[in-house]
Every structure is written in structure tokens, then in C-alpha cells.
Regions:
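Cell wall/extracellular polymer interaction/catalysis modules
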Residues: 2-152
Length: 157
């Protein structure tokens, strides 16, 4: 049995495509699209980038965010999740202590080395605006696709 994921889109899957368009210093801006339709802008830290490739996305309960999050690594080390639980966090904009790439809302990547792919609308170099209003519909689309038994695949270019 072949466990590799095909680079060809599959009809029973939700295919997200992350195209990195601008890389300067520690900022990597890009666009997230579904079936050729641009959905939102992305922002990543170049020191913690997920390598180009194809990743299955799964929803895993994240103790840091206290909710299910779309994670690029289905074999996420959940035994490390207690390390991610920050006592009395002042903000959810903290970095995670281990490399756990996921799609999440956020407006800046300064100091983030956890592989996060932040979604929002491009504002200026290194900044996104309206991250929550962009993330919520994207999350619902991913959640509904998974609940219908479809695969969700992220292709990073």
C-alpha cells in the first residue's frame, strides 16, 4: 500500500494551496487558495517555515488555544502538548515551545519559530489585519470537509 499523497488534486478532498510570494528577512508573505480561488493572505517566519510539499491537515485539540486547530502534522507529538499550556497567558499571540505547524489567526510573526501559518488580510510587510474574520470561515470549511469524510490537503509551494 502506498502511503504517499499524490500531488494531483483529488475530487473527494479539499485542496488548499499556499503560494509564497514575497520573502524578505524573517517575513514570508503568501496567498492561500482553494481550487484556484484566492481565499486570504498568509504570513510566516522564515526561520520556522514548513518546507515546500504536500501536507494532510487534521483537526487536533490544542491545549494552548483550548480548541481544535488545523495542524499540518497528523502525527503531532501530543505528549508535548502539556508544554504548550501556558499558565495565565496574557495573549494567545505567544509562540508555542515546540515546532507544531498549524493554520491560525494572528497579525505578526515576530519571534515565532513554531511553524505557524498565520492567515488574514495583507496590511504591510510583516503584518496582517482581520485575522479572526478570515480564520473562522476557513476553519469551518476545513471542519465541515473533514466531518463529511473528505481529506484536507495543503500544498505548499
Amino acid at each position: 500500500m502506498n502511503n504517499q499523497i499524490s500531488l494531483n488534486p483529488q475530487p473527494s478532498s479539499l485542496n488548499l494551496i499556499l503560494s509564497r510570494t514575497k520573502v524578505r528577512g524573517e517575513y514570508a508573505h503568501g496567498h492561500l487558495s482553494i481550487d484556484g480561488l484566492r481565499i486570504c493572505d498568509t504570513l510566516e517566519n522564515t526561520n520556522g517555515l514548513a518546507p515546500a510539499g504536500v501536507y494532510p491537515i487534521t483537526l487536533i485539540k490544542c491545549k494552548h488555544h483550548s480548541r481544535k486547530m488545523p495542524v499540518l502534522n497528523p502525527n503531532a507529538p501530543c505528549d508535548r502538548c502539556p508544554k504548550c499550556l501556558i499558565p495565565n497567558p496574557s495573549s494567545l499571540n505567544h509562540t508555542l515551545p515546540c515546532w507544531c505547524p498549524m493554520l491560525k489567526p494572528g497579525n505578526g510573526i515576530c519571534g515565532r519559530l513554531d511553524g505557524s501559518i498565520l492567515v488574514g488580510q495583507f496590511n504591510c510587510l510583516g503584518s496582517l489585519i482581520h485575522p479572526k474574520t478570515v480564520f473562522d470561515p476557513l476553519y469551518e470549511r476545513i471542519r465541515k470537509s473533514i466531518s463529511r469524510g473528505n481529506k484536507v490537503i495543503l500544498c505548499v509551494k
